Curated annotation (Swiss-Prot):
EC number: 2.2.1.2
PROSITE patterns, per the entry: TRANSALDOLASE_1, TRANSALDOLASE_2
Modified residues (Phosphoserine): S268, S269
Subunit structure as annotated in this protein's UniProt entry: Homodimer.
Gene3D superfamilies for this protein: Aldolase class I
Protein name: Transaldolase
Pfam families xrefs: TAL_FSA
MF-aspect GO terms: transaldolase activity
Main EC class the enzyme belongs to: transferase
Amino acid sequence: MSSLEQLKATGTVVVSDTGDFESIAKYKPQDATTNPSLILAASKKPQYAALVDAAVDYAKAKGGSINSQIEIAFDRLLIEFGTKILAIVPGRVSTEVDARYSFDTQTTIEKARHLIKLYEAEGIGRERVLIKIASTYEGIQAAKQLEEEGIHCNLTLLFSFVQAVACAEANVTLISPFVGRILDFYKAKNNRDYTAQEDPGVVSVSNIFNYYKKFGYKTIVMGASFRNVGEIKELAGVDFLTISPALLEQLNNSTDAVPKKLDASKASSLNLEKVSYLTDEPKFRFDFNNDEMAVVKLSTGIAAFAKDADTLRTILKAKLEA
């Protein structure tokens, strides 16, 4: 049995992390996740030119100013990719709200509702879509409101326990705690390597998983952003893992053992203290601000996603003006 099959056998749901949907079918993932960087990368590939053209044609038909058409084409392109992905995976696709709205609760809510409307116009129900939102205080508040409306959310760029606690209290459907980016920070800061067992990203996700299970939170923990298969194996048994096609391929080609490492039933006996952040913004900000890694990684993550979204807009603008 391949390492990938063994991972699935531990109870972990495997998700594909890519916009390049042609590369995922053979791994039989349950869900797929996208982000602006992945959509940008896929949009540059010749085999996806038709999707970009379809989004541009859709925006041209809607008319309006060039800036208005760019926004229409941008949102439409997310739906074009999402729709194609949902023809391959049986579960859900995650589609991200523009990172520039990461500190704007109301606009995030409005964008999410709009994306869901676009999907529903294509005959895709909201139960098959997760709206990805950065795990800022404002983003978590937006997600709380959206979940109450039946719009399911994936809270991303999650680097700290503080963010994770607030997300659980907001009853969000799923969180994406990043593993590899946490490792990147500590490797650079401390100028050393880490084994998979001591990997700070692995430790972070394990702690969040155990806290959620101990206190009965329903929010799904989906580890994300991996640098190697060692990190993935250390999280076997976690609810979900979203994995790039390159690492899925490594797992598929390996027969190394993948024993279950995380077990919800064992969390109940752990001596953990319950804390609260959702309705205490000063406490959230103070405790989050005391985690240098989380502050740096959230900031650079939002900036990088926003930059790639702007690059995508530039590509769409050129096509709209052609």
